[in-house]
């Protein structure tokens, strides 16, 4: 673990910074408004999605619950997975995703990942983030910031090689 006592960067507006950094990382952010319907917002971002997985009761647009599958290979072909983030980091737009599913592949195998995040649960930097998870007991967790991307020796950028092609964070 890094030295968490260091003075790290603090932002005047964590929400604004988070959104800007997420966009720079190739992700999308949407701030829910009081009149918004969460399922309609998801459908607006992913109108062509046929296979939407989620174990969250409020996600009525889900076509299946990944926890009910017998084999994680059945997740292959998932267009969108909808998950809850525990908190976000303004510094790098990373969201802490503790394992809330039977199979952790849910976070990586779908073409797109929608992360629901309480906008009040933003920290400034990774020092604050590590302090939040240091004493917690997680079987698995991952920080995710934007879509998966990699580049080869010729610097050809490829999205979705090791995870979702698109990541949308819906700030509630």
Where are these regions (language model features)?
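The feature marks the mature, well-folded catalytic cores of soluble enzymes
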Residues: 1-172
